[in-house]
């Protein structure tokens, strides 16, 4: 039994949901999202919210049950509140600035890195060393944050690079004489 899958997804006020077969579409104050549920689960829109249940007792159906419920919950939270991921930039001369639809990053390379900001994503650089990525699609926000972090991941000796806010970087000791 999926403990996550058993709970129905509550729909807050200001959010409308529609279930058409396996396609779930959710509309709210921040926008509209849709998700195609796998064939292993059934999705029903009821009074208590959106309920997900497995079609049969196979291992795959049970796995898809909890995953589908989480995906539907992410749709509802995304269109009502949105998602945000913060990055911290550490290092001498390392900085970020938003110019138009691009994020300009100085990360210690011989050239500045230009990262295009996709549609549906908002990037704010309040300080040169802090970047906030926000949007309604949790997967896309996490993917963009991961791509920016991958440009210069934190190194273990001095901790220079791009890291998630609150991320612990395992530090190593330098060479001994």
Swiss-Prot record:
Pfam families xrefs: Ribosomal_L6
GO cellular component, as recorded: cytosolic large ribosomal subunit
Protein origin, superkingdom: Bacteria
Keywords: Ribonucleoprotein, Ribosomal protein, RNA-binding, rRNA-binding
GO molecular function: rRNA binding; structural constituent of ribosome
InterPro entries recorded: Ribosomal_uL6-like, Ribosomal_uL6-like_a/b-dom_sf, Ribosomal_uL6_a/b-dom, Ribosomal_uL6_bac-type, Ribosomal_uL6_CS
SUPFAM superfamilies the record matches: Ribosomal protein L6
A GO BP entry: cytoplasmic translation
Family: Belongs to the universal ribosomal protein uL6 family.
Role summary: This protein binds to the 23S rRNA, and is important in its secondary structure. It is located near the subunit interface in the base of the L7/L12 stalk, and near the tRNA binding site of the peptidyltransferase center.
Subunit structure: Part of the 50S ribosomal subunit.
HAMAP family, per database record: Ribosomal_uL6_B
Protein name (record): Large ribosomal subunit protein uL6
Species of the source: Methylocella silvestris (strain DSM 15510 / CIP 108128 / LMG 27833 / NCIMB 13906 / BL2)
Lineage: Bacteria, Pseudomonadati, Pseudomonadota, Alphaproteobacteria, Hyphomicrobiales
